Amino acid sequence: MQNEHILKGVKSVERRLTFKDVKAIVKLGLVQGNLIPAFAGAFIAIMLSGRSFLSSIPELLTMLFGTTLIMAGSCALNNFYDQDIDSIMPSKQNRPSVTGKVSTASILQLSLVLMIVGEMLLFTINIETGIIGFLGIFGYVVLYSVWSKRHLVSNTIIGSFPGAIPPLVGYAAIEPSLSSTAWMLFVIMFIWQPAHFYALAIKRSEEYALAGIPMLPSVKGFKRTRLSMLFWVMLLLPTPFFMQELGTVFMVLASVLNLGWLLLAISGFRSNVKENKWAMTMFVYSLNYLMIFFVMIVVVTLIQTI
């Protein structure tokens, strides 16, 4: 009898939720990566509108917290919905939603609470910010997770819409009337995503095929995917010249970033290219690209106001 109590205690400890489990459920890395564009959108709105940074801190912090919650909630709901296919893919079989360490009911409750509280915070800033945040939730959960991910080869492109929402949320929190610069941030993030996610999909093409997810590399193959990646990278080339408000230095530096990615994309057409190695190089470059691009926006905008 005593041994049974001990065994139950051990199992309880083993199943206790850890911070690592929470990170996996809400996809913390993805959330953190999207906070940089959200902050950059808000910062550029502050600088271009002539508002004081200090007076904008309440809206800025509320926006960042609300955005964190709606993204975390959306990702948790994605984990809830994708349990069946995640259990098939080796890279995702250790997720708490798959192992059973966290019940499906708990994941669903967590996701709904996070999204509701996050939306409430965004609506306290202004109506526009709340609506844009809701569009992000709808796009990721409904248009991507439920509708396109399992049925359309264009799922990555459709998923790029909600993925490009963060800078708009940030900008609207400070200036509800979105400027052309705000929309360009949206366009750039939209264009950036296919090449980024196709690179990862090349490495996991067999997994996606096993799970029946029609990702481009799994359906059309490597040669077709690298053409698509080159196309999307090329679309980035003119974008800096639509952001003249940020100055010549920014346009030059952003163009250098774009050209570097273009050269890397072209290198994928070599006859002796190692597909997975090239894809991961593209993936890493895309991550650095996004971080450098938005940090550069903040720095350049700050310098202009000094």
Swiss-Prot record:
A GO biological process held by the record: heme O biosynthetic process
Keyword Magnesium: no
Pfam families assigned to the protein according to its UniProt record, in alphabetical order: UbiA
Gene Ontology MF, one: protoheme IX farnesyltransferase activity
Membrane topology: Multi-pass membrane protein
Subcellular localization: Cell membrane
A GO cellular-component term linked to this record: plasma membrane
Quaternary structure and interacting proteins, as annotated: Interacts with CtaA.
Alphabetical list of InterPro entries matching this protein: Protohaem_IX_farnesylTrfase, UbiA_prenyltransferase, UbiA_sf
Record keywords, A-Z: Cell membrane, Heme biosynthesis, Membrane, Transferase, Transmembrane, Transmembrane helix
Family, similarity comment: Belongs to the UbiA prenyltransferase family. Protoheme IX farnesyltransferase subfamily.
Reaction(s) the record says it catalyses: heme b + (2E,6E)-farnesyl diphosphate + H2O = Fe(II)-heme o + diphosphate
Name the UniProt record assigns to this protein: Protoheme IX farnesyltransferase
Annotated source species: Macrococcus caseolyticus (strain JCSC5402)
Pathway: Porphyrin-containing compound metabolism; heme O biosynthesis; heme O from protoheme: step 1/1
Entry EC number(s): 2.5.1.141
CDD domains assigned: PT_UbiA_Cox10
Transmembrane segments: 28-48, 53-73, 105-125, 127-147, 156-176, 182-202, 227-244, 246-266, 283-303
Chief location bin: membrane
Keyword Transferase among UniProt keywords: yes
Function: Converts heme B (protoheme IX) to heme O by substitution of the vinyl group on carbon 2 of heme B porphyrin ring with a hydroxyethyl farnesyl side group.
Top-rank lineage group of the source organism: Bacteria
More about this protein: Carbon 2 of the heme B porphyrin ring is defined according to the Fischer nomenclature.
